[in-house]
Amino acid sequence: MSDLPAHTSIWGELADVDHELRHVDVGGVRTRVLRAGSSGPDLVLLHGTGGHLEAYARDVAGLAEDFRVTAYDMVGHGWSDLPDQPYTIDVLSDHLVGLMDVLGIGAAHLSGESLGGWVAAWTAAHRPERVDRLVLNTPGNIADKPEVMVRLRESTMAAVLDPSDEVVRRRVEFLFHHKEMVTDELVGLRRAVYSRPGFVRAITNTLVLQDPEVRKDFAWDPDWVGRITAPTLLLWTDHDPTGGLDEAALLLEWLPRARLHVIEDAGHWPQWEKPEEYLSVHRDFLLTEAQTV
C-alpha cells in the first residue's frame, strides 16, 4: 500500500513544501529553476526530450527531506530560453555546469531521466569533479536503434506542430505504462510549452540528436562511458519503450562502478508512476550506500 497520498495536482504535490521557483541567467540563457530542501547533499534532477521540471513534481517533496534539490528546464526546453542553436549533448552539459556555477554548487549528485540521463552521464565523464554519484533513469536507446530515433522524432515533432489535446496526450502517454495516470493538467502543461513562440525551432534543435550523423559524436560508447568514475545506479523499468534490459547490460559492462535496479510495472517515467520506489532507491543509493564506501 502506498505511503504517499494520491496525486491530485502538481501544486498539490508542492503545496506543503518550502521551495523557490525562479529564473536565473546562465551564460545569457534565462533558465527556470525549482529548488527545495535546506540540508543534505545537492541533488540535481534532469528531465527528458521536450520535457520540463514538472516531470519531478511527485518526487520533490520526498527528496527535499534528505537533499538540497534542484530541478530545472534545460536550455531550449520548458520555460527556459530558446536560443537558435543545436542542443547537442555538450551544449546541454555546458548549460548544466553553468547552472551549477550560478547556484554555487561545486559538486552534486545527478539524476537524469531519458535525455537528462544522457546529459548527466556525459557530464560525469567530461567534468568528473562536478559529479558525486550518478543515477541514470531510463536513459533510453543506448544501442542507437534507428526505429527508436524515428519514433521519438516523429511523435515529438507531431505534438509540437499540432499541440492539440489529442496529439499532445498521445505524446505524453508514450512515457507511461499506465496511460490512465496521464492527467489533463500534465497534458495542458505540455501544450503550453509546445505552443510557446519559437518552440518549433527549439524542438528541431533538440531533435538533431535523433539524426544519426549528429548523434554519432555523442552516442553512448565505452570509450567515454568507461571514463565515468562516479558510482552509478542504472534505474530501469520493465516497460520502457525506448530501451530494454539488454541495453542496461551494455552499460553494466562499460561502467566501472555501476549496479542495476529494475522498477516493475512502469514505463519511461518511473518517477511519476512509481514515486515511492523511486524515492526509496534514491535514498538507498545516494545516502545509505555512500556512507558504506
Task: Name what the model sees in each region.
Residues M1-L43, D66-F67, I105-G106, R283-V293:
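Alpha/beta-hydrolase fold catalytic core
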Residues D25, V29-W79:
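Conserved HGGG/HGGXW glycine-rich cap/lid loop of the alpha/beta-hydrolase fold
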Residues T31, E147, P163-G226:
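Conserved alpha/beta-hydrolase catalytic His-Asp/Glu region
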Residues D90-A108:
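Conserved acidic catalytic loop of the alpha/beta-hydrolase fold
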Residues A121-A125, D132-V168:
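Flexible "cap/lid" loop of the alpha/beta hydrolase fold
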Residues V214, H239-G243:
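Acidic catalytic loop of the alpha/beta-hydrolase fold
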Residues I228, L234-W236:
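Short beta-strand/loop motif that positions the catalytic acidic residue
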Residues P256-V293:
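Catalytic active-site module of serine/aspartate enzymes centered on a nucleophile-bearing elbow/loop
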